[in-house]
């Protein structure tokens, strides 16, 4: 029974604990000993970068159109005005020059992605060279390596969406790599790209 004379915050926490039983979990988490060496914060840095990536990515999603359809650019950036380009590239240009805070969000997303990958690599290197991947933490190690692979795949997909020269070069290389796989390479490349390079579906699938 909650004391009615207790502060409102304590009464609210007691009410919440009676319904979801969170006190034990919170107490365990707060009592957990965390090493005081700075290198143990690199994993936390990756988590913060991931949070920033999610928030900025959601914002950018509202304005980006992952379509290879050719359009004529009529936006604010004069050097490209009147030139044909894909709708994906036009939406990226519009994000930089026409959408409020669009360029800031793009830059934050870009640098957060780079720092995210770098912090994962450094964190895994610390775990490896300190032997922290050994039993009983081998499952944590495998999860970390899997997350690194997924982060690299997502990073590749992200910069491939813009449909500029850099993304086109990367997609062409990836298409050739898939195509070189014996026996199933041709089938897999056609399945992923929706036909011969550049294909008509790859941008929407990456998105």
What are the functions of these language-model segments?
Residues 1-207:
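Membrane-embedded alpha-helical bundles that constitute the cytochrome b-like, heme-associated redox core
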